[in-house]
A protein has these predicted regions:
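Bacterial N-terminal signal peptides that target proteins for export
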Residues: 1-9
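Bacterial N-terminal signal peptides
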Residues: 9-18
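An acidic-aromatic pocket/loop used at catalytic or ligand-binding sites
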Residues: 22-133
Length: 133
């Protein structure tokens, strides 16, 4: 009887998590080090040897995404080593692309944003992994 109660409780907890949206959080591979961009949808997740990758999608501009991660990661001790913007954001070009490389200790985080013309949604690629330096 106890095993039935345990199984039922486990199923109920899983159902509650799905309903409440906790399955839409960043994958465990990011170990709470990188947050999901607010209201962004997780599109793809991969585990890599020594790291992980997540692809997100949002209706916000790439500039807004970049500023969020710059501020958020700086508050948690990461420093920016590389920041590149491939077209000025003020041109309001829908194909703007931006890239950030941040480091903390022996880990590196690369963030790439891109807004394709056909979808209008900004794609966010996050790569987190160990560094060799």
């Amino acid at each position: 009887m106890k095993s039935k109660t345990f199984v039922f409780s486990l199923l109920l907890m899983t159902f509650v998590c799905i309903i409440s949206g906790c399955m839409d959080r960043m994958p465990y591979n990011f170990n709470g080090k990188v947050s999901r961009y607010p209201n962004a949808k997780i599109v793809n997740i991969m585990r890599l040897n020594g790291g992980c990758y997540a692809e997100l999608e949002t209706i916000d501009s790439g500039e807004k995404v970049l500023e969020y991660y710059k501020n958020h990661m700086a508050r948690t001790g990461w420093y920016i080593r590389i920041e590149r913007r491939f077209k000025p954001f003020y041109l309001n070009d829908p194909e703007n692309t931006a890239f950030l490389a941040l480091f903390k200790g022996s880990e590196g985080l690369m963030i790439n944003t891109y807004t394709p013309v056909n979808s209008g949604k900004t794609q966010i690629a996050l790569f987190l992994g160990d560094t060799d330096v």
